[in-house]
UniProtKB/Swiss-Prot annotation:
Residues 24-42, 834-843, 1016-1027 have a biased composition (Polar residues). Disulfide bonds: none annotated. GO terms for cellular component: mediator complex. It comes from Dictyostelium discoideum. GO terms for biological process: positive regulation of transcription by RNA polymerase II. One of its GO terms (molecular function) is transcription coactivator activity. This is Putative uncharacterized protein DDB_G0281251. PANTHER family: GATA ZINC FINGER DOMAIN-CONTAINING PROTEIN 4-RELATED, LIM ZINC-BINDING DOMAIN-CONTAINING PROTEIN-RELATED. Residues 1-85, 335-371, 660-694, 798-843, 1016-1035, 1334-1364, 1454-1497 are annotated as: Disordered. Residues 1-11, 51-79, 810-833, 1454-1494 have a biased composition (Low complexity).
């Protein structure tokens, strides 16, 4: 602006300016009163003409400047209005704030702002010129100051017309509006002259305020508009820097400090002093909160309620009316209802997005909100637009410094952050972090903490309403923005060669203030200095140990005013506040072990549990279950949903599409084709068989034919058995949870908890019993939001991670020893068991787009005592794959990661997971960021100083990358900010324990009784008092169970008061399973975020919880006793009754069954997804499925069908991990045992199986057949004695004969190698048993031959009797050999079989029966000998021949047992004996020698086993005349 323009604005332009402002005030406050008439301009710009309005209750009429109102019930009349008074247009009541914003939506708002600011600067310049000339009198000086003050007041009112009252511009979401962006664009730029004037005025205001606060008789001083002016001007980054340099911010925060102490002194709401000061102090503190957040460059992105913000045009022509464009929403997602949240619609799943949120997964603690666009873009745009104006002001500022005697070298560009650059651009991140530290030194955190403590003390029983609630939300939002905004990476410590670093000194002359015997420094924080290392460790500590974290914790949890009878708006406001608090807690403790320790010691996780419970209790879906009711319209309730789903499993999609409920589509399994390597999602009921033609009708439900209806369809389906290729997609599709009306509040809560699940500190290291005296609430300058922490491998590192409990861990480390002597002298046995609960934790490396991570897995040799390791390299980030390593054997696993970034910075990381048997030596883990040096200190800080909480606790040591290859510490590339850095994260095990072991624990439910004052370690049973040391005092902050009981008794007076809280909690779970469904979605999102969470979830007994009565059930009645069921049926929750007043009981029942059926299918889908995720080992999942199958084998065949189909899907989708799990679990013992149980049950019932039992049996047969034909599993099946027993047992039954013969012949074709350990062991043991049995068999034969030798005359035996005798002897020898083999294999592994004892007893009884049969045969032989003596004379030669044949057969059998023969084919072993021939006229059973699978094992013992098979098959063939034709592809 030149001088002519300034003179016009100061002289002739003032009258027009004030007229415009007065007209604007009239528009902002339209009113009508008696004897007066106000003119309201018509809204012609909107196209709305002024018309007369009439109301149903009252009307306004004006005659001769008199206004009269006539009311007559529902009708009204009005007299004619005068011509000069226009009426308010219809609809104007909906735009109460619209007139004030209309000015800013056009170019007029910017013109008025520029005119007022120019007038203020001209008046200030004239005043200073007059003072220098000493020609102005005192009265003229006062009038000049009054004129300047009035101009500033009008300027503030132009930006905020109600600056002295609580208004919408003080809310947390105002910064996200378009008007805020427009005002930010029009913010003027300060200079030194203006800043000094404002500083003097603020100093006078603070002095007057301090007097008024100490004396209630004094009036409230004038000067609040100066605080508001600083709030408006500090929005510009240029103004913020200058305000800091001139110490203009100290006075506003001193006023806020005085205001917070005044709030702390209030004890009674009816006190006149409280009534006087409370509205004023709210506005003062709110402006100071906004001033503090203005120094955060990413304010909109960090705010939780960030939906959108205004955008401006880059047109610099201020005279153009179209230079300010009303922008649309720039939010990355859909608009969040109720002040933020997530959409209830199902998002589309793409490879680059999260399957639950629909957004790209990011770091859990990388942002304070869900907005994707930062305020830095607007600030950068403002900087570029004001660049020319800044350069024009530099010359004027330089002249001003020369006038007041300052050094000529001190220029405006020298003082911005102490950096002088060659260009005029300023890094917003650098400026923001530098200024935030200055805000911390002004005591902002202590002001916010005192304000929160005021709400905790003053609003114990009453909930804050309206402006009080908005003010409370603003305080916690400010705290979160400051802590999270302080985590940005900076480049202040390192500059390029083109920059020069200077020091901008600013002395703070404000003295210490002593109020209420408490010394308050100018800085509410103290900056810790690491004197040992000679650097700053950047730890900011609050003034009192532990009290601040306790104040924040007391803001959440169950409150006395939280009741189900409250309005939804009141509960929503309380929820939003507590959700903000949880996010602040996450930012505070996610990267600081001290804060985490005190959060746990003050029962922080129990408070989070209370939040989960009261949110589940109080909230319902916003649509009152409308979407759920629409989704369950086709849900059939005529029969149990589980039985219907089981009957439809295996049906073709074309036949079952019209009869299949919606929920049965929830479980998906990948179906793999032999010609395609990619996996596609199919239904669990998918089938490849279309042979079934009949349909079944059950309970008015048409059941289509399925592949498990008969064994013939099962055999046909085995032809199409295929398995997934190893090169297929590793990440399977997550299960689709039941479509329902979600509770938005619960979804938002678990979204925050998910971000809280990954931290930079190991929560397993927290020592709750530590007597640490440091005890301060510490928060890093570079928090978990943006910092990148990875381990340095300069030395051999050893990390002893404790178990996920609260037990203390002592690390005996030798800091002087830099060598890692990890000597393990113990032999580790490979037991193939479940992952042990060793003292280990999993460190997580986050993935980046441009990173290649190689993990070397060095596992100690189990059979060696040396230190040699077997290394294998796995590339886990190429091809977007995660390699998961499970410590199934409990041995040492060393993870060595080498990470290479785009900036050629190589950093290595080592974490050793050791057992208690290992020696823990020196642990030197140096946390290194490859981008910048964020803290000083030595690079040799030991890991023990990080894990041990003591007085010398030091935060993670972050040093500049000295191991970077190809870059120096001063190289720009070495400190370049990476968009997706790798963070070394730890899983928050205490949070998982809170959700799993405490929230759904039966012990927890039983402890919730009437004795609330007793001290207990359980979370809810403890009294939720403000003072954790005094748990016996009764106060208003009672436990969740007591509040719920009292609330329930008011609604149901007839309810027994002795009702336990266990029933109450069961009532919450059983009213609707929304909490369980949210936890399932939380677990899926947790594992997708990082697969390393799955072993930790297994360690916390995830599957025991999922399949327990606390979580997984098909109906609510399955988990409760009779008393609980009666109570639940007679009472309903408030949310259910309020939303279901017009819904019938049948619809309520259908909705409930629909949701719980979705919970059951969701649990099955969860275990299938985790079992196939990343093709990893799924031993525990397979084990729990088999356990549930055994439990449900007889009582619930529908569960058996679902679980067996689940096993089929998992085996086909993930054969790489499943096959090994099945081998460890000895699946060929498990399934035959189930078949034996079903076989005995069918015999004992003396009736045919029902439809479900038969289908359960058939699906088990189908799974067994699929396992037998598997290439690897078939060789384990051929040597499993229990499987062979069951297959020959099924031969005796006509219905299962075909299936059994098919499997037997397939096993007979296998080419088993005699070198395998299982076959060798079986052969050696069976030979010994056969020798013993042959010796026992020879004794009765010798006794029977003695009478024959004594007889002098030979007897003649008929030819038919001789043939029958030969067959009997051959069958006896073969049965003995088969029985000996069975006993041998049974004796080989007695501990692995679940039914080994019963089977051994059955085998011994079989031997006794055979001995009795032998005795009977001997008696028959003696009778035959008497008959033969009569015929000896007739046939002497025939008798001699038969005796010779018998002796020869016995000698051959003895030779076969003692000496093994060479490998032979089946035909050579069988010979030409007619009794053992497989080919006949009535049967086509044949085995070709030319077949590729016609060879037998290389042992006569196995040949004897197959001879037994052949003999039994021949006997069955003679009994039946059926024809079998088998074709093996």
């Amino acid at each position: 602006m030149d001088k002519n323009n300034n003179n016009n604005n100061s002289n002739g332009g003032h009258e027009n300016l004030f007229k415009d402002l007065q007209n604007q005030k009239r528009v902002q406050n339209p009113s009508f009163s008696s004897g007066q008439s106000r003119t309201v301009p018509s809204i012609s710009a909107r196209g709305v003409a002024p018309i007369s309005s009439s109301s149903s209750s009252s009307s306004i009429s004006t005659t001769n400047n008199t206004t009269t109102t006539t009311t007559s019930g529902t009708g009204s009349t009005s007299s004619p209005v005068s011509k000069g008074v226009p009426l308010i247009p219809i609809g104007a009541s909906r735009f109460k704030q619209q007139p004030s914003t209309d000015v800013w939506r056009s170019a007029r708002g910017q013109q008025l702002s520029e005119s007022l600011w120019s007038s203020f600067k001209q008046a200030l310049q004239n005043s200073q010129n007059s003072q220098q000339s000493l020609s102005q009198s005192l009265s003229q000086s006062h009038s000049t100051n009054s004129e300047i003050n009035n101009i500033l007041l009008e300027f503030v009112k132009h930006y905020n017309s109600e600056y002295d009252k609580w208004n919408v511009e003080m809310g947390v979401d105002y910064a996200n509006t378009k008007v805020y962006g427009i005002k930010l664009y029009c913010t003027p730029v300060l200079d030194i002259q203006t800043t000094l004037y404002l500083t003097r005025q603020l100093c006078s205001y603070v002095l007057n305020l301090s007097k008024a606060l100490t004396d209630d008789n004094l009036d409230i001083p004038d000067g609040l508009h100066f605080i508001c002016l600083i709030n408006i001007l500090s929005r510009s980054p240029l103004n913020s820097t200058l305000l800091h340099q001139e110490n203009a911010l100290a006075h506003p925060f001193q006023a806020a400090r005085l205001a917070s102490y005044k709030l702390s002194s209030f004890r009674d709401k009816n006190n006149p002093s409280f009534t006087k000061w409370w509205p004023y102090l709210k506005v003062l503190l709110a402006n100071c909160c906004q001033i503090a957040t203005n120094f955060v460059h990413d304010k909109q992105n960090l705010s939780f309620n960030s939906l959108r913000y205004g955008n401006v045009n880059n047109n610099n022509n201020s005279n153009n009316n179209n230079n300010i464009v009303n922008s649309t929403s720039l939010s990355s997602g859909s608009l969040l209802s109720n002040g933020g949240g997530i959409s209830t619609s199902e998002p589309e799943i793409s490879p680059s997005t999260s399957p639950l949120t629909g957004t790209t997964p990011t770091s859990p603690s990388s942002s304070w909100s869900s907005s994707s666009i930062t305020n830095h873009q607007i600030q950068h745009q403002i900087l570029m637009q004001q660049q020319q104006q800044q350069q024009a002001q530099q010359q004027h500022t330089q002249q001003y410094f020369n006038t007041i005697g300052q050094s000529s070298s001190y220029s405006y560009t020298n003082v911005i952050n102490g950096v002088s650059t060659n260009n005029s651009t300023i890094t917003a991140t650098t400026t923001s972090n530098f200024l935030i530290q200055h805000i911390f030194k002004l005591g902002t955190i202590s002001i916010l903490m005192d304000s929160l403590q005021f709400f905790n003390d003053f609003f114990k029983t009453l909930q804050p309403k309206d402006s009080e609630d908005s003010f409370r939300l603003l305080i916690i939002d400010t705290l979160g923005i400051l802590i999270s905004g302080n985590g940005g990476l900076t480049t202040t410590t390192t500059t390029t060669t083109t920059t020069t670093t200077t020091t901008a000194t600013s002395t703070n002359t404000t003295p210490n203030t002593i109020i209420n015997n408490t010394t308050i420094n100018n800085s509410g924080l103290t900056n810790s200095i690491n004197n040992n290392n000679g650097g700053n460790n950047n730890l900011n500590k609050l003034k009192e140990p532990g009290n601040e974290i306790k104040t924040i914790i007391n803001c959440i949890g169950m409150k006395a005013y939280i009741k189900t009878s409250k309005k939804v708006t009141s509960l929503q406001n309380e929820f939003q506040f507590q959700l903000h608090v949880i996010r602040v807690i996450k930012e505070l403790i996610s990267n600081n072990l001290n804060n985490a320790k005190y959060f746990n010691s003050h029962r922080g996780f129990e408070k989070i549990q209370e939040v989960i419970l009261w949110v589940t209790q109080c909230f319902k879906p916003t649509d009152s279950h409308t979407f759920t009711d629409e989704s369950c319209l086709d849900f059939d309730t005529s029969m149990p949903a589980q039985e219907l789903s089981a009957l439809l499993i295996g049906a073709t999609s074309s036949n079952s599409s019209n009869n299949l409920p919606n929920l049965t589509n929830s479980i998906s399994s990948p179906s793999h084709s032999s010609s395609s390597s990619s996996s596609t999602t199919t239904n669990i009921n998918n089938s490849n068989n279309n042979t079934a033609t009949a349909t079944t009708t059950t309970s008015n439900v048409i059941i289509p034919p399925t592949m498990y209806d008969s064994l013939n369809s099962v055999l046909n389906s085995l032809k199409y058995t295929t398995y997934s290729e190893k090169s297929s997609s590793l990440i399977k599709s997550p299960p689709i949870i039941v479509k329902r009306s979600k509770v938005v509040q619960l979804s938002q809560l678990f979204q925050v908890l998910h971000s809280f699940s990954f931290t930079l500190v190991p929560f397993s290291k927290i020592q709750t019993n530590s007597s640490s005296s440091s005890g301060n609430l510490n928060y890093n300058i570079y928090s978990s939001s943006s910092a990148s922490f990875i381990n340095n491998n300069n030395n051999n590192n050893n990390c002893n991670i404790s178990s996920p409990t609260n037990q203390s861990v002592n690390n005996n480390n030798n800091n002087n020893n830099n060598n890692n002597n990890n000597n393990n002298n113990n032999n580790n046995n490979n037991n193939n068991n479940v992952l042990p609960r060793s003292n280990s934790s999993y460190s997580i490396f986050r993935r980046g787009d441009s990173l290649n991570t190689i993990i070397d897995i060095n596992q100690d040799n189990n059979n060696s005592n040396s230190n040699s390791n077997n290394s294998s390299t796995l590339d886990i980030l190429n091809n977007s794959q995660d390699t998961i390593v499970d410590n199934n054997n409990g041995s040492n696993i060393d993870f060595e990661a080498t990470i290479t970034t785009n900036t050629t910075t190589v950093v290595t990381a080592t974490v050793n997971l050791t057992n208690n048997n290992n020696n823990n030596n020196n642990n030197n883990n140096n946390m290194i960021d490859g981008n910048t040096e964020v803290t000083g200190g030595s690079a040799h800080n030991s890991w023990s100083s990080y894990t041990n909480i003591n007085e010398q606790f030091q935060q993670l040591s972050l040093t500049s990358s000295t191991t970077a290859t190809g870059s120096s510490p001063t190289s720009p590339t070495a400190f370049q900010y990476q968009s997706k850095p790798i963070d070394k994260m730890f899983v928050n095990t205490l949070l998982i324990e809170t959700i799993f072991e405490k929230l759904f624990s039966q012990l927890n439910l039983s402890a919730l009784n009437e004795n609330h004052s007793t001290t207990s370690s359980l979370p809810i049973s403890q009294n939720l008092s403000d003072d954790s040391s005094n748990t016996n005092t009764n106060n208003n902050n009672t436990s969740f169970g007591k509040i719920y009981i009292s609330d329930n008794l008011q609604q149901n007076p007839n309810t027994d008061k002795s009702l336990s809280c266990g029933k109450i909690f069961n009532k919450i779970k059983n009213s609707t399973p929304e909490l369980q469904l949210q936890i399932i979605e939380y677990l899926i999102k947790l594992v997708i975020e990082n697969p390393y969470c799955l072993p930790i979830l297994r360690r916390f007994n995830l599957w025991e919880l999922i399949f327990s009565d606390n979580f997984y059930y098909s109906s609510p009645q399955a988990t409760l006793n009779d008393d609980d069921i009666e109570y639940l049926l007679n009472s309903t929750t408030t949310t259910t009754t309020s939303s279901s007043t017009n819904i019938s009981e049948e619809q309520l029942k259908k909705r409930k069954l629909y949701l719980f059926n979705g919970l059951r299918l969701g649990c099955l889908g969860l275990i299938q997804f985790f079992s196939t995720f990343n093709n990893r080992d799924n031993f525990e999942e397979i084990c729990i499925i088999l356990t549930e199958m055994r439990k449900s084998l007889l009582k619930s065949p529908a569960s058996v069908i679902e679980l067996c189909q689940l096993l089929i899907n998992i085996t086909k989708s993930n054969p790489q991990g499943t096959i090994q799990s099945l081998i460890k679990l000895r699946i060929f013992q498990q399934i035959p045992q189930m078949i034996q149980v079903l076989f005995k049950y069918e015999q004992a019932s003396n009736s045919q199986f029902g439809l479900l039992h038969k289908k359960a049996r058939n699906i088990i047969f189908s799974y067994l057949g699929q396992l037998i034909v598997h290439e690897e599993l078939s060789y384990h099946a051929v040597v499993e004695k229990e499987l062979i027993d069951v297959l020959f047992l099924l031969l005796r039954k006509v219905e299962t004969k075909t299936f059994s013969i098919t499997q037997i012949f397939f096993l007979m074709k296998l080419n088993v190698s005699s070198s395998s350990p299982s076959v060798t062991t079986l052969l050696s043991s069976s030979s010994q048993v056969l020798n013993s049995y042959q010796q026992q068999q020879q004794q009765p034969q010798q006794q029977s031959s003695q009478p024959q030798q004594q007889s002098s005359q030979p007897q003649q035996i008929p030819q038919s009797q001789l043939q029958q005798q030969n067959q009997t002897q051959s069958l006896q020898s073969s049965s003995l050999s088969s029985t000996s083999l069975l006993l041998t294999s049974q004796h080989q592994q007695p501990s692995t079989s679940l039914l080994s004892t019963s089977q051994f007893s059955s085998s011994s009884s079989l031997l006794q029966q055979q001995q009795q049969q032998q005795q009977q045969q001997q008696q028959q032989q003696q009778q035959q000998q008497q008959q033969q003596q009569q015929q000896q004379q007739q046939q002497p030669q025939l008798l001699q021949q038969t005796q010779q044949q018998q002796q020869q057969q016995q000698q051959q059998q003895q030779q076969q047992v003692q000496t093994p023969s060479s490998p032979q084919t089946l035909a050579s072993l069988l010979g030409n004996s007619s009794s053992n021939t497989l080919t006949s006229s009535s049967s086509t059973l044949s085995l070709n020698e030319s077949s590729t699978l016609s060879r037998l094992p290389t042992s006569n013992n196995l040949s004897e086993l197959y001879r037994t098979y052949i003999s039994e098959l021949s006997m069955i063939k003679e009994e039946t005349s059926c024809t079998y034709d088998f074709k093996f592809d």
